[in-house]
Amino acid sequence: MKAIRKSVVAATGIALALSLAACGGGGGDAGGDKAAGSSSGKSDNGADKALGAADPAAMLKKAAAKGAEQNTYRMKGVRKDDKGDFTTENAVQVKPDASDGKDVGPKTADTPDGISHVIKVGDKMYLNGEKVPGKKWWTLNLEGAKGRDASEPFVQLTTALATAKDVRNAGVETVGGRRAAHFEGTVVRSELAAYKGDAMKEKDRDDYAKDLKEEGLEKVTIGVWVDKDGVIAKTEESGKGSKGEYHRADEYSDFGADLKIQAPPAAETATEKEVIEYEMKKQK
């Protein structure tokens, strides 16, 4: 029984990692900032001048603090790693814990259509895939599992960039319909692991350094776009390491919105017990 359950858990692959990583479980306050991300995408000489002259350290610190206050948001982007090229989207609610994420990439045995769709509501994780005939979804009970208690990924990237020795203001661009200052720099894993400053929380520092190590990356170029209201509009990270090229870029929206994340219909979802019982029957 334990061996079967272990194989069932392993079969989640990218989907399980997506849901756990994309919802970092940071300490956002309920309600968030409904006005976040409302800056105009039209060029404004006064606003653009202020964004172009913004100090990286000060603006990144402000953006990270504002980001940590957000309880809900959407992210949409692209990712390239050793598993292939993906388009990604995720709706995240920090408290109560919920997320709805989808990866679309290469077709595999676990994802024959190339789609990995994971919904997490509390201690229940729902994954797309017909593990039991006639059921479009199957579920895992995460009760008792140790979740991440670090900040949300976009806050981690922003504070990681703030630790970079070469961080700079690269100019003003339009992202997601809003004008934003583009900050860029190189984060070296060994330097980050030894960082003792106050730009990044110790837990976030350790988690991000671990993430880089798992991706086989010793250094990455990070980009963070921040609008005039101090809201993070986009993050990007790129590098080349032992596993090849890595690139990820995400845009953020709907801060503070009611995302209406819900579990799939019970009639279409196989329970963990049903999945295990079906796997046992197949092995007889």
Spans of features found by a protein language model:
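C-terminal motif of bacterial Sec signal peptides marking the signal peptidase cleavage site
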Residues: 19-22
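Subset-of-secretome marker
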Residues: 2-8, 24-284
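Hydrophobic helical h-region of N-terminal Sec-dependent signal peptides
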Residues: 12-16
